[in-house]
């Protein structure tokens, strides 16, 4: 198998950096090499330096493969959080995730998927819409890739796996081959970190002990396991985070990107206020400000209470009823438009409305449940 450029970056240091450390000691251990990276990010205000893309890739490689010590890893994560990762550092981290993490490929002729990047530590304040949005898009033939894990620090919020399970669709416990086969046949893939990326899962305890989101949390918003052409939709909270995301993903070669100031940093669009997002094509961001009021979708965002209530409301929404139907119509309609399934925004909202009224989204859920019952 021919190695990809990302694999080369993740596995090799830049020539200059390699020469500088090897000349000092030809047999440096992983811990000794990691000291050089830690020394850069962990210095004082005047002397702290950003890592190069290659250095950042190697630093995360050493972390994921446990060649750095626990003390070094903890120090690096908190120092990097305080200083904030630079775009090229995030790109280097992406290189390593691409090299060491799971890989998902579309079938020949399959439509490009929409890959949603949301905080892995879940939601605690607002009712998630994205599982239902995914079902509406799937019912129109639009493939979807989601990623997440079990409950984790710092929020310990509700996860994608739990939400789908409450609807009767179990998406954990699958091998990557099974996930890819299901994706190619049904259009949906959930990359579940405990099953598919154990190296990254091993770092969860550091989040708990640090008590803050490390830079890995920013990385999770930018990474997708999908290889090939796709539309990447990434959530953000603060404008500086969005700017770093644009630059990092441009360096990483992402061609089609949407950044969303969504609910709790997710890709869910609020209906209580204007939706701020950017559509980045060929490296040029176009700011979009979308008003739910213009499409008859303005209302209060639905609060999160518990999984039982959410499941009931979610099934109602798939049948075009209940409090989640309005935010679902808004979210699904917007993403139908942005993914190219609709000619304009109004047409997208109309398509979403038609899917809900016809029961197409609920039928898609039923088909996925049948598929899962026949796997494994």
List each language-model region with its residue ranges.
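Structural motif
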Residues: 112-115, 142-145, 162, 187-194, ...
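Short, small-residue alpha-helix embedded
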Residues: 328-339
């Amino acid at each position: 198998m021919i190695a990809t450029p990302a694999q080369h970056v993740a596995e090799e240091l830049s020539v200059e950096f390699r020469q500088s450390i090897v000349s000092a000691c030809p047999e440096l251990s992983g811990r000794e090499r990691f000291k050089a990276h830690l020394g850069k990010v962990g210095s004082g205000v005047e002397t702290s330096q950003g890592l190069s893309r290659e250095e950042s890739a190697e630093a995360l490689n050493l972390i994921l493969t446990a060649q750095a010590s626990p003390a070094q890893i903890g120090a690096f994560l908190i120092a990097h959080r305080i200083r904030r990762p630079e775009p090229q550092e995030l790109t280097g981290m992406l290189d390593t995730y691409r090299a060491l993490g799971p890989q998902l490929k579309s079938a020949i002729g399959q439509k490009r998927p929409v890959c949603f990047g949301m905080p892995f530590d879940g939601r605690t304040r607002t009712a998630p819409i994205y599982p239902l949005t995914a079902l509406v898009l799937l019912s129109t033939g639009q493939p979807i890739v989601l990623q997440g894990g079990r409950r984790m620090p710092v929020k310990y919020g509700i996860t994608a796996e739990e939400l789908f399970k409450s609807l009767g669709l179990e998406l954990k416990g699958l091998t990557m081959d099974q996930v890819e086969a299901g994706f190619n046949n049904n259009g949906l893939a959930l990359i579940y970190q405990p099953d598919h990326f154990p190296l990254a899962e091993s770092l969860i305890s550091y989040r708990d002990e640090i008590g803050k989101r490390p830079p890995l949390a920013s990385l999770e918003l930018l990474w997708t396991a999908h290889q090939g052409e796709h539309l990447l939709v990434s959530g953000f909270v603060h404008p500086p985070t969005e700017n770093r995301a644009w630059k990092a993903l441009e360096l990483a070669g992402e061609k089609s990107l949407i950044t969303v100031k969504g609910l709790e940093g997710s890709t869910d669009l609020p209906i209580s206020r204007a939706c701020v997002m950017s559509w980045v094509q060929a490296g040029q961001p176009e700011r979009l400000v979308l008003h739910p009021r213009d499409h008859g979708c303005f209302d209060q965002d639905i609060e999160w209470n518990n999984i039982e209530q959410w499941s009931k409301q979610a099934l109602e929404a798939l049948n075009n009823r209940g409090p989640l139907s309005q935010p679902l119509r808004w979210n699904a309609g917007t993403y139908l438009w942005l993914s190219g399934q609709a000619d304009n925004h109004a047409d997208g909202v109309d398509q979403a409305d038609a899917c809900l009224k016809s029961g197409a989204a609920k039928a898609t859920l039923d088909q996925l449940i049948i598929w899962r019952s026949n796997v494994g």
